[in-house]
Each structure stands twice: as structure tokens, then as C-alpha cells.
Amino acid sequence: KKQVKLTIGIPTYNGEQFLKEKITSILNQDFTDFELIISDNGSTDATKEICSNFAIKDKRIRFFSHKKNLGAVWNFDFILKKACGEYFMWTAVDDKILPGFYEKNIEILEKNSNVVCSASQVKYFGKNRNYWVERSTRGYFKALKKKMVKRFQNLQNYPVSGTFQSKFRYYLKLRGHHHMFYGMYRTEQLKKIWLLDVNFTE
């Protein structure tokens, strides 16, 4: 199979509420050299029907439907093993990706050969957005920052020396920075160091 520039993976379970908007937003991006892998982890809603209909209409979509739920980590791993793109990223079914995201992150990776991952800032949207804004005005995030100083120091002291693999493993084990997990990686390198013993539940 001809290699595409980017593999985008959506692991999902009962995601019918978000799937149509999510898939449409990806297909409508200006960047087109990608494959979209959707792995349905035994959903009981209309997820399978929605994804199947999209896959029929667009050959860039590869849809896999599993009869039972095999766990979230298994689903992430399944998608990575199927990836054919030079670059790779998982994306949550309820996240939105703004225009230009793919091009900007690919450019960063191509200009910086030893960068572990290229990620973006996160903005809240939807019905919970005002909840987070209100909490921030009450000093919630200032208090949280004090409690998280030790955790954030792990990121601030991120190693700049060492092998690509060692830095990659360090990055994947960071706690409290889940949005960066959904950044963009080099597929070949990620497959080399990706291990299911990386504990995502700690």
C-alpha cells in the first residue's frame, strides 16, 4: 500500500453523539494526504452505522468494528499497528481540530529531526466551557498550580540529550499532560518504542 503522509486514528466507543461532526471536520481539512483509521470498540449505539457510511463515501477511511469491548489501551494499540502514514496521531472522538493543525505540526517535525512530538494548545468548548472559565476566575487554577508544581517540573526538566527512543519513553510516561498524548508523532519511531506496559492508569 502506498504510504500517506499522515495517519489519523480515532479510537471510539459509543461515540455517535460526536462522530459525524468529528469525521466531517477531518475530511474538510485543506490537508488531504492522510488515512483515517476508526476503531470501534464494541459500541452498542449507532457508531458502526455512522462510520460505515462515511467509509463507503471516502476511500481514505479505514473502519474496523470489533464485536466486544477489548479495553481502551488495546484500541489505541490496534490503531497504531494498522497505521501506514509517515506521521501518526490519535485524536479523541469529542475533540475538534482547527484548520491548519496537520500542516503546522508536520512542518515542525520535518524541520526538527530529533523532536519527540509536536502538540498544540488546548481550548475548552461546549457546555462545560463556562464551568472552567468560572473556576479560573475564582483562583482555581492558581491553587491547582501550587499542588502540581512537582508534576510540572517533570515537563520543565525534559531531557534534551540522549537517544530519540529514551526521550520518547520519558515523554509518554509524563503524568498530567494528557492533551500532549494527542500530538503528532513519527510513526516508525513510535512503533519501535510503544509498549503496553506503559501505565496510563497511574
Segments from the language model and where they lie:
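Nucleotide-sugar donor-binding/catalytic module of glycosyltransferases
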Residues: 1-202
